Design a protein with these regions (language model features):
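Short, small-residue-biased leader/transition segments that mark boundaries at the very start
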Residues: 1-3
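Substrate-binding cleft/loops of secretory-pathway carbohydrate-active enzymes
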Residues: 14, 20-63, 68-79
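Active-site clefts of carbohydrate-active enzymes
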Residues: 19-39, 76-112
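Substrate-binding cleft of secreted/luminal carbohydrate-active enzymes
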Residues: 50-73, 87-160
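Pro/Thr/Ser/Gly-rich low-complexity, intrinsically disordered linker/stalk tracts
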Residues: 139-140, 144-195, 250-260
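Solvent-exposed loop/turn segments flanking beta-strands in beta-repeat/beta-sandwich domains
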Residues: 189-215, 239
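Short beta-strand segments within Ig-like beta-sandwich modules, predominantly Fibronectin type-III
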Residues: 219-225
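Beta-strand-rich modules
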Residues: 230-253
Length: 260
């Protein structure tokens, strides 16, 4: 990474530390001990020293274009994760190959890659191109909705920028008006950092206390202000108990205030 690029990263962080600086490099960095890159890689072919940038700590996220399968995908995805320096690796998946005119991959191939990503602790995946996702090519959209993206997700924290959680909110009250809407209100977190003022995550569950480690319990996130109206589309699915946490722009989440 040249000095100028280092200055760019430091300049961004000086102005807005929570802004993520990321790169979308060629999918294979170098030959690995597990499998060769077969002559086309980021480092030697297009001079992208991305793992060097990760080592310097001047990247927050990497989206390697891993539009491959088999031995051209798995060893290189793992290599990125092993050299991540704690940063977030989000492989780009070549879902356009599901189209018969592009490659006629099967849906199983993409699903195996996503299971691998989760099993090895990578931060997520990107889908290229979105057209093939929205067109539900080979049932991809349905598979993601039913099997992979079944619950909301909070943004991953960036502890190398800020690892201090905001103070929790307090005084959570829950009103149940006659129209079936739940009105939640609370006292704000007491943090004074106006540039990194926390927002709130609302959780709901049928059991008490509400388990805020379970994403299935997330009802809303990035809530501003100190009130929230819970209006379930299907009243018979309404949650019974509620909790609220504060979360800052770097993804640090406070302890929860539980409904009393």
């Amino acid at each position: 990474m040249c000095i100028r690029d280092s200055y760019i990263y430091k300049g961004v962080k000086a102005m807005k530390p929570w802004v993520k600086v990321s790169t979308c490099p060629v999918g294979k960095y170098k030959d690995t001990s597990r499998y060769p890159s077969r002559g086309w890689n980021a480092f030697h072919t297009v001079y992208q020293d991305v793992q060097g940038w990760l080592g310097e700590g001047i990247q927050d996220q990497i989206y390697p274009m891993l539009y491959f399968r088999g031995n051209h995908f798995y060893p290189f995805a793992l290599d990125w994760q092993e050299q991540s320096n704690g940063r977030q690796i989000i492989p780009g998946l070549g879902i356009y190959f599901l189209d018969p005119s592009e490659g006629n991959w099967t849906l199983d191939e993409i699903e195996r890659q996503m299971h691998f990503i989760r099993a090895h602790g990578l931060a997520g995946e990107a889908h290229y191109r979105v057209k093939y996702l929205m067109d539900n090519t080979q049932g991809l959209y349905e598979a993601l909705e039913e099997d992979f993206y079944t619950a909301p997700a909070l943004q991953p924290a960036m502890p190398w920028i800020d690892n201090v959680a905001p103070t929790p909110p307090s005084g959570l009250t829950v009103e149940t008006p006659e129209n079936g809407y739940w009105k939640l209100s609370w006292q704000p977190a007491t943090d004074n950092d106006k540039r990194n003022a926390p927002m709130y995550v609302i959780y709901g569950s049928d059991t008490y206390p509400v388990d805020t480690s379970n994403p299935e319990n997330i009802l809303a996130q990035r809530v501003q202000g100190t009130e929230y109206t819970y209006a379930p589309i299907r009243p018979w699915t309404a949650r019974k108990y509620f909790a609220v946490t504060a979360i800052d722009r770097c993804g640090n989440e406070s302890e929860a205030i539980q409904q009393q």
